[in-house]
Each structure stands twice: as C-alpha cells, then as structure tokens.
Amino acid sequence: MANNLILLGLPGAGKGTQAEFIVKDYPTVHISTGDIFRANLANDTSLGKQAREYMDAGNLVPDEITNAMVADRLNQDDVQANGFMLDGYPRNEAQAEFLDHYLAENNSAVSATLYFEVSDSLLRERLLGRGRADDTPEVIDNRLEVNKAANLPLVDYYKRAGVLHTIDGGRELAEVYHDVKAVLDNL
C-alpha cells in the first residue's frame, strides 16, 4: 500500500522545504490545499464556483466544499498509485475525521503525520527573514496564534490515532530531513 502522509506545523516550521526533499526520495504526490483551490477556481469547476462565492464575500470556504475538493484530488490516478502527502489539510478535527472516513471507505488510511515543532522565537525570526511587506511582528504573532489554535487539536487527534511523529524542525535542514527519513523508512 502506498504511504499517505500529513504534514503539520506552524508557518515557518519548514513543511514546504521538507516536502520538496520527500518527493525527491519517495514516490508520493505532494498535495497543497492552496494548489487544489487554485486549480478548481482556474478551471471554473462546480466546487470552484461554490468556493468563489464564499471567498468573494470574504468568508471562509465551508469544510464540505474543501473536503469535496480534497476527495476529488485523492481520487486521481497519480495519488491512487503513489499515495499522498497533504500540506495545509486537514485544518481542523472535522476535516481530519472526514479524511479518515474517506480513506477507510477506500481501504486506505493515514500512514504518518509529521509534526514539525519549532520554537515561537525561531518561527518569528524565519518569517521576518522572508522579507514580505505584510510580515510585521504583530501580523506574524497573530498568524502564529491563529495557527496554534488550529494545529494543536490536530496534533492531539493524530497522537490519539497513533500516527503522529514529532520532529524538531528548529535544526539544520539536513538534520531535520534525517529524522523525516527515519520515520518514512520505517512505514
């Protein structure tokens, strides 16, 4: 069975960087929720049209629409053959439960959840170092707090499920990836 991975961590924890390393060494499909949304919006799909209505009104897209977009992507041949690595989904426990049920219906499951743990001070330093105009200390602190509120229940959820692997993301890239490989090589 192909491995199905979830990457969790606060902004600046290194999820995207580690995902780039993982896809070079392991046959898995990196799926970013942002990419799924952009594809549905660009292709003007039924789900994309529904999502656009919420987004244009300045509202969050409901879980049902996000879940349906993710399910459509997970149903594609490349994912069926190689498994997936989700980045940016699930964002809450209801989405995690949907994903578990969806996978179970398709005789599959989450193989591992990699949680990249990094201190707040290092996250701030990394995010400020990106040089984005909107990355002020106040905006960054708010983003970290909002993301903590979403991430921590998911960390607990996957810990209870027995698939959580906490990785110290505050070290050199090669050291972090060494720990990632140790997890993936034992799946």
From Swiss-Prot:
GO cellular component: cytoplasm
Keyword Kinase attached: yes
Top-tier EC class: transferase
Positions of the UniProt region annotated as NMP: 32-61
Chain residues that bind ATP: 12-17, 130, 171
Gene Ontology terms describing biological process: AMP salvage
Principal location listed in the UniProt entry: cytoplasm
Residues that span the membrane, as ranges: none
InterPro entries reported in the protein's UniProt record: Adenylat/UMP-CMP_kin (IPR000850), Adenylat_kinase_CS (IPR033690), P-loop_NTPase (IPR027417)
Pathway: Purine metabolism; AMP biosynthesis via salvage pathway; AMP from ADP: step 1/1
Domain of life: Bacteria
Annotated region described as LID, given as residue ranges: 129-135
Catalytic activity annotation: AMP + ATP = 2 ADP
Coiled coil: none
EC number assigned by the record: 2.7.4.3
Record keywords: ATP-binding, Cytoplasm, Kinase, Nucleotide biosynthesis, Nucleotide-binding, Transferase
Cellular location(s): Cytoplasm
Swiss-Prot/TrEMBL domain comment: Consists of three domains, a large central CORE domain and two small peripheral domains, NMPbind and LID, which undergo movements during catalysis. The LID domain closes over the site of phosphoryl transfer upon ATP binding. Assembling and dissambling the active center during each catalytic cycle provides an effective means to prevent ATP hydrolysis.
Subunit-level organization: Monomer.
PANTHER family attached to this UniProt entry: NUCLEOTIDE KINASE
Function comment: Catalyzes the reversible transfer of the terminal phosphate group between ATP and AMP. Plays an important role in cellular energy homeostasis and in adenine nucleotide metabolism.
Protein name in the entry: Adenylate kinase
Organism of derivation: Leuconostoc citreum (strain KM20)
